[in-house]
Amino acid sequence: MNFFCKLLAPRASFVQDMTPDERRLMQEHAAYWKEWLGRGNVVAFGLVADPRGAFGVGIVDFESEADARSFADGDPTIRSGLGFQVEVLPMPMGVVRG
């Protein structure tokens, strides 16, 4: 089943004013998602340039919401304790190009 994941940064200006440590964390975040992309669980992910504050979006494919939540909670940004938040919502219907 597909799930929608939305990653919220600790502040609206995060993309513009990341510290060097936060940049390294975001590299770990991207590597984590790319690893799961290679495993076939990540369908797509990326940055949304919302003028109110950029956020991350991902579509993932897992057997259960618990598995999707476990994946999201394993993201280095969430484990960092720096104030990132993630929403995981089921997508009971969807259409994929292909």
Where are these regions (language model features)?
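Conserved, structured core segments of small domains
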Residues: M1-G98
